[in-house]
């Protein structure tokens, strides 16, 4: 059994009880601190710099290196403006600890676990240190089980693993945020789970927009904050690298509590995992490490591993992680995305071409992949249906150039049938979302995996060849598509 979180945070009580050091050097976000002999803090201990006299300064740092000669090197979690050599530094005697549990839901926190949403203080009776070891082998749940999202294209073609890690690839404006919000909504409704969102080094405006959209869609319940389905932890682009480097761990620590103590299924969103690596590379040289390939930190794999290995299923519950991955200059061989890929179980690729056609969620059925899509895991029926959907979509893609030049009439009868079915499949992969109801006016749909498979089998078998393709656009299950086709027929007769 893992140790429970502490029920009191390491508060700096009186100066006499704590180790006191003094700042010896400041280089940007990195501080060197001298402590008395024999009173050195441990690696990862939190240090607090207090201002002199009337100056209100309260900067928290984290010990990264013990340099010898009673000096330690620490990374600041907030701006070091106004700090001077000789200032007193207090060793708290423990790592950074953050509030965990139900009190975190519906609130926004910074890397230190302090609320930043102007909604008053948070109950901090239960806190947990952000540095913990990954669960032991004996605690892991190694069964392969599908994490049903209720989103047709995901469940059929690139299913998520319960306790797995999913990479979310997509440019600006293709629907990443809406997809993330729908997943948060569906895990709460279908799995009774909660979500934690870690905003790592992204734009402050985007963080604010996400918060506002979550309030609009009901994911954050303003009237009764305790009924919210998500906790938000932000370390945005304007924060020092120390905060961006640790904010992912703060979010993960909150998620671990829901998994280990509340025994819930948790969704952990990290947006963006690349910024976590980038923040580490910013301080790496200041910490005196030799850079490795492309200037990244030599500890890149270790840092990534220590975060990713804590994201897993245990016998108590699961943390399923969805990580937005920025690919610098679209170079997939760059060490940062390449290291991330090694940890992913599935990839969900969002396509601008599909978004332009108005097909939402704009998940690319051919580029998205999953290690779960194997007959021994998902079953023969699911696997066969998914493969046939992909084959039909691939054939349609190959024929598009011919159609553009010569037109549909020049295709063989068989190819014309394939194109017609592929267009129905493309539209049936779209789906109305609960969180988009306020914008679209059409009620959201949660489609179970069995219903999804049945629908695509009917399209592939040719039973629905007589229905118009627009009947399949933005519907839930296949019965809704047939009902919509009948309505369209009635409408067209009335017009005549």
Swiss-Prot record:
Q: Does the keyword Lipid metabolism apply?
A: no
Q: Which residues form the signal peptide?
A: none
What catalytic activity does the UniProt entry give for this protein? Answer: ATP + H2O + 4 H(+)(in) = ADP + phosphate + 5 H(+)(out)
Asked if Nucleotide-binding is a keyword of the record, the answer is yes
Which InterPro entries does the UniProt record give?
AAA+_ATPase (IPR003593), ATP-synt_VA_C (IPR055190), ATP_synth_F1_bsu (IPR005722), ATPase_a/bsu_AS (IPR020003), ATPase_alpha/beta_chains (IPR050053), ATPase_F1/V1/A1_a/bsu_N (IPR004100), ATPase_F1/V1/A1_a/bsu_N_sf (IPR036121), ATPase_F1/V1/A1_a/bsu_nucl-bd (IPR000194)
A Pfam family cross-referenced in the UniProt record is ATP-synt_ab
The processes (GO biological process) annotated in the record are: proton motive force-driven mitochondrial ATP synthesis
Q: What class of enzyme is it?
A: translocase
- Family, per entry: Belongs to the ATPase alpha/beta chains family.
Assembly and partners? F-type ATPases have 2 components, CF(1) - the catalytic core - and CF(0) - the membrane proton channel. CF(1) has five subunits: alpha(3), beta(3), gamma(1), delta(1), epsilon(1). CF(0) has four main subunits: a(1), b(1), b'(1) and c(9-12).
Per its record, how is this protein called by name? Answer: ATP synthase subunit beta, chloroplastic
State the species of origin: Trachycarpus fortunei
